[in-house]
């Protein structure tokens, strides 16, 4: 007996996600019950559909969104290190489900077993505002036709079949794992993840979070706790100090308790500087903290630790100093602090940060050698590298590549043209000041280096990995091309040594750094000075990687499959930093710290625990906690979008937020959305 259209639908649900939100659906299908296999067993596939329900006209509302979804589905057994034998088990994913578009995937039932389990993720791709959301619906049916054209759906949402169970996990569920009742006595190792510019921790760093948790098996004597601060989302143009202070207060006031005995930091892009400021702030403002907690790992991935001045044209420095991307742009442009008279990144590279960094067990920087249009190699690696060896490894990789070249080889989603016209074109008018330039070379080098425009496009439309790359680990080329520990003695003593010696001025990887006239040379010397300060009295492990585009987001696997080229980088990070070699229950330093006499550090106010700040810190470190007056341009153009959006949201039933909720208007609400964009067109001119 055939199923009717109604009972062909096994599950139907509606939900929505805001910036930094994801929802996971764990789909369990019981093929049969009992020990005996039924004679009439059906092995027909199930079908999954995720539909973006926002109106079609919202595609133009890029500054209030963009209203897009990332979706993927895989079997529960899938792991990227294992070869996929059956092609039907190949993960399905779509990096950019636009409004009124569908993501449809087959859930293959091809073997006789009692239970099948799949995991589907739905992630928001909103970048700029906290007050808009993407509405979507999830449908599971017994045929492709039933999910593509559903009708006569039951009025209630949920599962309509006893064979199908779907568990929905929200962002909070995924980031707050259930407390293990068997480990209350264990010491905790807190791992803090920090996102970069126009990013968020809860979706963009969720892959790293889950991989770190998988390393828990290496730590029988302690419990790993991975957290990230969500309060800086859509605030990232307000400056390193503003963002770092908020992160530090979050660590102290919300995360710390007496069970936390170790701490590690992992920061991507701007997040590397933010976490560095937070560490310095905690060290001085809450001096008791690092007497109670042992610092273990300080890790950055593609972070502009020296700023981004010399790899850009001269006019970029002017734009940064004017605050085109807010206070953050001024920080990255090495603009002098008005009160102190020195750039924040210069101040940050000295005391007190260096003093506490020396106590970390490991300090590691990961840097992209190629295909990163946001953060150049020299600033992500703290400048001093064996560039000749890196160039040699790149040439070997090119010659020995099993597949196509390292650039322009990956498939690109078919809606690239529409996306470029409606999103990238206006966006780059505002953000193009972060565009490392391509300098001509005498020998016509073919070292690939994507532009900022390509990187901006790849945030939401990344060049997709090849099918073989995802299915077969043996098909993947090595990406770690340089992995070395640099001690202070390895650093050249003068600029002369840099230009003519080990670090080769003529190396094409450094041509952008050394190009330019006297004005550029001034900032080059400043960046070199900052780099030397980072190396004083300690060693750094520097890992240089060669990733395909978009390397800046691939290095953190921003989306599990769309940015899969970064899998080996995160594998390396876990293997090196979370391998269990620092797990022990008899750490002498830990025992000393746990019994060390510390001044009273907490008071109770209205039932909430608060930790006291130091009453006085040395005058030379006053820049850490000096209250600043924020100007309107400290937020930059896209930072202001969020602020304006919050104001609009507060005006009841007025403006854009009222339009998207209005159902019975006399006019088509889509027209009002378009008019809203037209009225605010000055934001994108």
From Swiss-Prot:
Gene Ontology biological-process entries: lipid catabolic process; lipid metabolic process
Highest taxon of the lineage: Eukaryota
Enzyme class: hydrolase
Active site (record annotation): 269
TM segment ranges: none
Keywords in alphabetical order: Hydrolase, Lipid degradation, Lipid metabolism
Matching PANTHER family: LIPASE ROG1-RELATED, LIPASE ROG1-RELATED-RELATED
Name the UniProt record assigns to this protein: Putative lipase ROG1
Organism, scientific name: Saccharomyces cerevisiae (strain ATCC 204508 / S288c) (Baker's yeast)
């Amino acid at each position: 007996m055939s199923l009717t259209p109604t009972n062909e639908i096994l599950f139907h649900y509606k939900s929505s996600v805001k910036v930094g939100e994801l929802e996971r659906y764990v789909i369990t299908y019981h093929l049969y019950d009992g020990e005996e296999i039924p004679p009439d067993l059906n092995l027909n596939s199930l079908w999954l559909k995720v539909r973006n329900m926002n109106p079609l006209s919202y595609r133009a509302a890029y500054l209030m969104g963009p209203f897009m979804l990332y979706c993927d589905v895989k079997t529960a057994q899938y792991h990227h290190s294992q070869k996929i034998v059956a092609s039907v088990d190949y993960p399905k994913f779509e990096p950019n489900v636009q409004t009124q578009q569908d993501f449809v995937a087959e859930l293959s039932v091809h073997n006789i077993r009692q239970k099948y389990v799949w995991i589907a993720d739905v992630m928001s791709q909103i970048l700029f505002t906290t007050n808009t959301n993407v509405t979507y619906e999830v449908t599971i049916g017994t045929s492709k036709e039933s999910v593509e054209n559903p009708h006569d759906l039951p009025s209630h949402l949920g599962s309509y079949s006893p064979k199908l169970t779907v568990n929905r996990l929200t962002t909070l569920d995924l980031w707050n794992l259930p407390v293990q009742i068997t480990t209350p006595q264990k010491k905790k190792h807190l791992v803090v993840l920090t996102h970069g510019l126009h990013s968020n921790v809860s979706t963009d760093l969720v892959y790293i979070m889950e991989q770190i948790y998988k390393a828990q098996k290496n730590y029988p004597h302690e419990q790993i706790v991975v957290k990230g601060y969500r309060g800086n989302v859509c605030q990232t143009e307000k400056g390193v100090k503003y963002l770092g202070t908020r992160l530090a207060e979050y660590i102290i006031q919300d995360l710390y308790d007496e069970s936390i005995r170790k701490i590690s930091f992992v920061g991507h892009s701007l997040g590397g500087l933010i976490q560095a400021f937070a560490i310095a702030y905690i060290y001085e403002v809450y001096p008791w903290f690092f007497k109670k907690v042992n610092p273990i790992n300080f890790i950055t991935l593609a972070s502009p630790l020296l700023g981004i001045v010399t790899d850009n044209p001269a006019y970029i420095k002017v734009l940064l100093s004017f605050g085109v991307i807010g206070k953050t742009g001024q920080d990255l442009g090495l603009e002098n602090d008005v009160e102190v008279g020195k750039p924040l990144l210069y101040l940050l590279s000295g005391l007190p940060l260096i003093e506490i960094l020396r106590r970390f067990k490991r300090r590691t920087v990961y840097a992209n050698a190629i295909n990163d249009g946001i953060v150049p190699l020299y600033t992500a690696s703290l400048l001093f590298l064996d560039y000749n060896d890196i160039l040699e490894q790149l040439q070997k990789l090119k010659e020995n590549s099993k597949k196509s070249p390292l650039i322009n080889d990956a498939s690109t989603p078919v809606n690239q043209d529409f996306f470029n016209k409606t999103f990238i074109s206006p966006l780059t008018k505002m953000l193009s000041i972060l565009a490392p330039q391509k300098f001509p070379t005498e020998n016509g080098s073919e070292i690939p280096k994507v532009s900022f425009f390509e990187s901006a496009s790849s945030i939401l439309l990344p060049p997709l990995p090849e099918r073989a790359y995802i299915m077969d680990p043996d098909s993947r080329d090595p990406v770690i091309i340089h992995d070395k520990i640099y001690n202070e003695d390895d650093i050249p003593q003068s600029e002369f040594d840099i230009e003519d010696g080990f670090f080769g001025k003529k190396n094409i990887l450094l041509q952008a750094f050394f190009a330019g006239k006297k004005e550029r040379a001034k900032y080059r010397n400043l960046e070199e000075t900052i780099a030397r300060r980072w190396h004083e009295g300690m060693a750094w492990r520097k890992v240089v990687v060669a990733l395909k585009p978009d390397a800046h987001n691939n290095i953190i696997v921003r989306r599990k499959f769309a940015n899969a080229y970064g899998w080996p980088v995160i594998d390396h990070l876990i293997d090196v930093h979370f391998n269990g070699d620092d797990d022990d229950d008899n750490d002498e330093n830990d025992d000393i710290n746990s019994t060390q006499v510390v001044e009273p550090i907490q008071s109770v106010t209205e039932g909430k625990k608060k930790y006291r700040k130091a009453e006085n810190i040395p005058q030379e470190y006053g820049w850490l906690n000096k209250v600043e007056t924020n100007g309107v341009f400290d937020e930059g153009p896209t930072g202001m979008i969020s602020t304006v959006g919050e104001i609009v949201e507060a005006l009841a039933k007025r403006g854009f937020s009222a339009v998207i909720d209005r159902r019975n208007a006399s006019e088509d609400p889509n027209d009002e959305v378009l008019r809203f964009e037209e009225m605010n067109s000055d934001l994108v001119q």
